[in-house]
């Protein structure tokens, strides 16, 4: 059931993986603004099913310092923003902290997440053939060690995509218009790669968009979105990064 503190609903798991065809559903009262989950057992999470939330508009944070791997059948069914990270802790406002590396150091508060904190060395995040989408105007974040997107698409129509790769201890502070990096001695590598021939998928956003090839970052929609990338090295093998405005709303 988790522990609710104000608008934050905290969950703690020893292990967290979703096999093909399975789902994990987060539920709670409509007063919840943020679902914040951590994995403390020291094993990487393999997600090849659906991560779902039944709480309208709630954002989802999933934290596993041991690593995160999304398979080709992984999907998101969340009406708010989604942030996945291999950070060791989340720093909350008002002196709060939700720690996956040392759970006993946690101090739960009603304040929102203000920073992703890393110890050395950060674990990787891999999306292998998946199509991860958030609703219109929401944010999709991958914040960890080396990040690899292989035949995968991240899609945030008229929203925002954050990709941060780090290689040492420090904190990442997302703001409305930037990603602030504090204390990092080294950064990680982002690899976007697509095989020469891959399947295509069609996404209907209410405006003509056509087919989105796998291996892309896309924030196109009624209003142009934003893509923020922070890292030490970026390797792009056949992938695309693009944001277009199809409607009357201004881009960002």
Annotate each predicted stretch with a short phrase.
Residues 1-252:
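Extracellular and secretory-pathway beta-repeat/beta-biased strand scaffolds
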């Amino acid at each position: 059931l988790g522990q609710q503190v104000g608008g934050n609903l905290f969950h703690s798991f020893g292990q967290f993986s979703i096999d093909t065809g399975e789902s994990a559903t987060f539920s709670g009262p409509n007063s919840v603004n943020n679902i914040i989950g951590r994995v403390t057992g020291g094993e990487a999470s393999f997600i090849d099913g659906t991560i779902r939330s039944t709480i309208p508009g709630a954002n989802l944070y999933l934290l596993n310092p041991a690593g995160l791997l999304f398979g080709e059948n992984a999907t998101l069914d969340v009406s708010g923003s989604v942030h996945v990270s291999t950070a060791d802790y989340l720093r909350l406002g008002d002196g709060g902290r939700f720690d996956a590396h040392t759970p006993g150091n946690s101090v739960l508060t009603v304040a929102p997440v203000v920073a992703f904190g890393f110890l050395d060395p950060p674990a990787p995040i891999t999306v292998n053939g998946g199509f991860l989408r958030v609703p219109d105007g929401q944010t999709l974040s991958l914040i960890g060690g080396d990040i690899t997107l292989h035949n995968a698409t991240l899609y945030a129509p008229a929203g925002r995509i954050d990709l941060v790769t780090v290689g040492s201890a420090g904190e990442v502070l997302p703001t409305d218009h930037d990603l602030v990096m504090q204390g990092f001695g080294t950064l990680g590598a982002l690899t976007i790669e697509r095989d020469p021939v891959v399947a295509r998928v069609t996404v209907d956003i209410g405006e003509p968009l056509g087919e989105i090839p796998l291996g892309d970052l896309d924030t196109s929609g009624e209003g142009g979105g934003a893509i923020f990338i922070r890292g030490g090295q970026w390797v792009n093998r056949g992938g695309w990064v693009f944001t277009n405005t199809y409607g009357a709303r201004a881009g960002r």
